[in-house]
Curated annotation (Swiss-Prot):
E.C. designation(s): 2.3.1.222
GO biological process, one term: propanediol catabolic process
Protein name according to UniProt: Phosphate propanoyltransferase
Species of provenance: Leptotrichia buccalis (strain ATCC 14201 / DSM 1135 / JCM 12969 / NCTC 10249 / C-1013-b)
Residues annotated for Zn(2+) 1 binding in this entry: H34, H36, E95
Known role: Involved in 1,2-propanediol (1,2-PD) utilization within the bacterial microcompartment (BMC) dedicated to 1,2-PD degradation by catalyzing the conversion of propanoyl-CoA to propanoyl-phosphate.
GO MF entry, a single one: metal ion binding
Keywords: Acyltransferase, Bacterial microcompartment, Metal-binding, Transferase, Zinc
Keyword Metal-binding: yes
Amino acid sequence: MDRNELERIIREKLQEILGAEKDDTFMVEASGRHVHLTKEHVEALFGKGYELTPAKDLSQPGQFAAKERVRVIGPKGEFSNVVVLGPCRSFSQVELSLTDCRQIGVKGVIRESGKIEGTPGILLGVGDKYVQLDKGVIVAKRHIHMTNEDAKRLSVKDGETVKVKIHSDRPLIFDDVLIRVRDSFRLSMHIDFDEANSCGYTSGMTGSIEK
């Protein structure tokens, strides 16, 4: 068992314990820069018939970090070795922090995942193969994944925005946190590395909705 798998199991056990002790507390996870690809773009970058290789399960059921990596190339710079998340989607999307966007010269547009109309494009590369996206670069709006049962218990609904208190050595309250409800989800809040740095993020950190 590798370290990432062990951390995932620990997070799940902590969630069970915290859920039993305090129903309104949930795990907070920090997401680094990453890419979602369509099947067409996977084949364009890695070869015809190519399938992503799962390397690590993510906290959301069925989602995984793939072994494959890409270059994200902007007007003023690029990031190499950017992780691809699977499975393939119906649209390609690049998720960066605002700091990342400034570094490579791309406009940072804060959006819910999947809401890519009107967002900047970017060039993706693997070796001598490239894919030009005409849209799809977003700064992910901070959000909480939950089931319908979780939403009922926490008195929130899909698409609502809430305030979340972060329990850490640098406690703060995040405003405008999006609620995303689907029964295939597992309860957890997702923030990016800029947000994680602002609250002194550590693995296993928790949050709760402020009423």
